[in-house]
Amino acid sequence: MCIRDRIRTYLKNRTNLRLTEIVTMAGGEDCKISKTQIMDGIIPIERHGIDRHSYVFCIGGGAFLDVIGLSAATAHRGVRLVRFPTTTLAQDDSGVGVKNGINAFGKKNFIGAFAVPYAVVNDFQFLYTQSDHNNRSGLSEAVKVALVKDGVFFDWLEENVEALHALKPAALEEAVERSAILHARHIALGGDPFETGSSRPLDFGHWTAHKMEQLTDFELSHADAVSVGVALDTLYSARCGWLAEEDAWRAVGLLRGLQLPVWHESLDLRDGEGRRLVYRGLEEFREHLGGELTVLMLEGVGQGVDRHSVDEALHEACIEELKTASQEGIPT
């Protein structure tokens, strides 16, 4: 049975809901740079008289959820959105969040809005429609949140790395569920769901990731960029003396064990004065949140700490170290 038939069957037996239209649109990161896709999401809402007591069901990956979420948040200043994330990355992270947005001016999520979804349905069946690479790469956010929030979960990821690499259903589904719960719990109980302050621990490694995505014209996936960013800031935390060296290499080893990248060639791009372009991402990251630059680093597995500067020379040494490890194929 195709997805359209499944949707119709699901809603047929729910007499209090009336299906108006099933709309298929393009997904992937390209949809976040489209100048028309937000309106493409709004037009059916207007056409069918969808009101603030109606629902938009959105089925897709993280980028698609971001765009249609913004459409729903904008129409009537907010139509109820029910998310059905279809990828590992969306199910274990962004799908349970409160952010919606698109890329603009070459910057990640420059246009967007905070809007709490009415509901999120993580159906594991969707994961088995994805490529092996997509399913593995989405685990970068699980590694991230474990490093920041839950050392026991990190230990579990290490212990189950072979099963996760092989995409064994029981391991994959448990990793996704535990990651989603940690993300949702922080948003709901962390005290700043709409990021009015200057700290955002769930964006560990993301200042690098977002800039690398931009430098590659968004050809580098968010999941892979996060893997590199997490590896870099974890090693940097150790080089600054905040995190044990052994723990830093445990994290890098876990990412490598999941067949995820810990370095990317975009890190070698430099301006005319020889400064790595990725470091422009620090100011863009600060501007996006506002206030003082605040980047999360690690002082233990499962324990993050806010810092307000990055020593570029020391960080560069980490880039070079991970580049060497990556080129030599060392599963550190």
Describe the residue ranges of each PLM region.
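ATP/NTP phosphate-donor binding region
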Residues: 4-55
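Generic secondary-structure signature for well-ordered alpha-helical cores
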Residues: 12, 16, 116-119, 125-132, ...
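Glycine-rich beta-strand-to-loop/alpha-helix junction loops that act as flexible
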Residues: 27-28, 59-61, 204-205
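Active-site and donor-binding regions of nucleotide-sugar-utilizing enzymes
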Residues: 50-82
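A glycine/threonine-rich phosphate-anchoring loop and its flanking beta-alpha core
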Residues: 69-163
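C-terminal charged capping/lid subdomain of soluble metabolic enzymes
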Residues: 140-143, 242-332
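Active-site segments that bind and position negatively charged phosphate/pyrophosphate groups
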Residues: 160-274
